[in-house]
Amino acid sequence: MLDPNSRYVSRLTRDTVALVLAGGRGSRLHELTDWRAKPALHFGGKFRIIDFPLSNCVNSGIRRIGILTQYKAHSLIRHVIRGWSSFKKEFGEYVEILPASQRYSPNWYQGTADAIYQNLDILQAEAPKYILVLSGDHVYQMDYGAIIAHHVETGADLTVSCIEVPIEEAAGSFGVMTVDDDNRIIRFDEKPQRPTELANKPGYTLASMGNYVFNTEFLFDQLRKDAADPDSEHDFGKNIIPNIIAEKLVSAYRFRDHDTNETAYWRDVGTLDSFWEANMELVSPNPSLNLYNHDWPIWTYQTQLPPAKFVFDDDSRRGYAVDSMVSGGCIVSGGKVKSSLLFSDVHIHSYAEIEESVLLPEVEVHRSAKIKKAIIDSACVIPEGMIIGHDHEHDKARGFRVTKKGVTLVTREMLGQQPAGTSAK
């Protein structure tokens, strides 16, 4: 039974350092991550994916945070510096960026475990009791104090946060585990094509969320052993966890909604389809992810922008948005927006029609353009009269990417415009 005392949990979180793994590209997002790491990708109208684990840390009372970066990290680093640099150093609080810097070898980060190992001296200087390793590219709201308390109460060497997901979703994408009646992990497979089915929930498997709580000295010992193994891929899911479950106590912490005890909201958004779907969920009347929860806010950096503006109300042109999220700085000037997300500084010109689409910051859609079921990357300028998402063969012929589920991706390069990596965003 977990101790519900808030001071007890607060003491545990103060004794914890969080390390956010934020160096991945997210290759299944294709051109959307050509110029940015996946954790830097915009999400939910005004946020970036990295804001979710960072906000979870802050809301949980964890104020010592390291962010490990590698792949095309400029926009991620810029966002963290602008939005997450106000911690009180005098109180021992910080968010530090830990780029691959070849501290222990001539190589860059070779895997998730190696990324932590290469910062071992920094962690030793901090001397926390517990280390919380987090994936930086998932969308969810989670109290990390609960999993740390679970870890301590069970006496585990390692605790893995997990969630029930459909087998077809987990196949080839997530690490999956088998547990006994005490939630001790007895088997762990990294991204198997045929995940083990849950006995009490047909069609589902128990998937790793990529979040781990370690006793600090235990983690250090395992990292040193792994670094000395020439056959290791230096990955938690592939090497560390499978190698220790037979001899050490590795516990599974099931992530559930505290109010309903059902499986909590968690999205990987690792494909274009899942990214589009997760954003589209937010425009529904009662989405599973509550961004309006004042008890668990998602913090972020945002520029000072004026309110969204809707202009023109003539019979022939009317600027409006319905069942949509429209961010600051947007102007809908005589255009129609339905079931869509407009990120900051988007401009929709007269007679343009946007439906079931995600428009990232600084997109401009000129007169009479029509966009349906699409993702438009940052700073794209959609020419007058262009039609996107209505004819997939035509989209493909112009070099746009169309997913299996019929979502069209458009980037600046596809439009023959200046690459996103050198634009304002």
UniProtKB/Swiss-Prot annotation:
<dbReference type="InterPro" id="IPR023049">
    <property type="entry name" value="GlgC_bac"/>
</dbReference>
<keyword id="KW-0067">ATP-binding</keyword>
<dbReference type="GO" id="GO:0008878">
    <property type="term" value="F:glucose-1-phosphate adenylyltransferase activity"/>
</dbReference>
<dbReference type="InterPro" id="IPR005835">
    <property type="entry name" value="NTP_transferase_dom"/>
</dbReference>
<feature type="binding site">
    <location>
        <position position="208"/>
    </location>
    <ligand>
        <name>alpha-D-glucose 1-phosphate</name>
    </ligand>
</feature>
<dbReference type="InterPro" id="IPR011831">
    <property type="entry name" value="ADP-Glc_PPase"/>
</dbReference>
<dbReference type="InterPro" id="IPR056818">
    <property type="entry name" value="GlmU/GlgC-like_hexapep"/>
</dbReference>
<dbReference type="Pfam" id="PF00483">
    <property type="entry name" value="NTP_transferase"/>
</dbReference>
<dbReference type="InterPro" id="IPR011004">
    <property type="entry name" value="Trimer_LpxA-like_sf"/>
</dbReference>
<comment type="pathway">
    <text>Glycan biosynthesis; glycogen biosynthesis.</text>
</comment>
<keyword id="KW-0547">Nucleotide-binding</keyword>
<comment type="subunit">
    <text>Homotetramer.</text>
</comment>
<keyword id="KW-0321">Glycogen metabolism</keyword>
<keyword id="KW-0119">Carbohydrate metabolism</keyword>
<dbReference type="Pfam" id="PF24894">
    <property type="entry name" value="Hexapep_GlmU"/>
</dbReference>
<comment type="function">
    <text>Involved in the biosynthesis of ADP-glucose, a building block required for the elongation reactions to produce glycogen. Catalyzes the reaction between ATP and alpha-D-glucose 1-phosphate (G1P) to produce pyrophosphate and ADP-Glc.</text>
</comment>
<keyword id="KW-0320">Glycogen biosynthesis</keyword>
<dbReference type="GO" id="GO:0005524">
    <property type="term" value="F:ATP binding"/>
</dbReference>
<dbReference type="GO" id="GO:0005978">
    <property type="term" value="P:glycogen biosynthetic process"/>
</dbReference>
<comment type="similarity">
    <text>Belongs to the bacterial/plant glucose-1-phosphate adenylyltransferase family.</text>
</comment>
<dbReference type="InterPro" id="IPR005836">
    <property type="entry name" value="ADP_Glu_pyroP_CS"/>
</dbReference>
<feature type="binding site">
    <location>
        <position position="109"/>
    </location>
    <ligand>
        <name>alpha-D-glucose 1-phosphate</name>
    </ligand>
</feature>
<keyword id="KW-0548">Nucleotidyltransferase</keyword>
<feature type="binding site">
    <location>
        <position position="175"/>
    </location>
    <ligand>
        <name>alpha-D-glucose 1-phosphate</name>
    </ligand>
</feature>
<protein>
    <recommendedName>
        <fullName>Glucose-1-phosphate adenylyltransferase</fullName>
        <ecNumber>2.7.7.27</ecNumber>
    </recommendedName>
</protein>
<keyword id="KW-0808">Transferase</keyword>
<dbReference type="InterPro" id="IPR029044">
    <property type="entry name" value="Nucleotide-diphossugar_trans"/>
</dbReference>
<feature type="binding site">
    <location>
        <begin position="190"/>
        <end position="191"/>
    </location>
    <ligand>
        <name>alpha-D-glucose 1-phosphate</name>
    </ligand>
</feature>
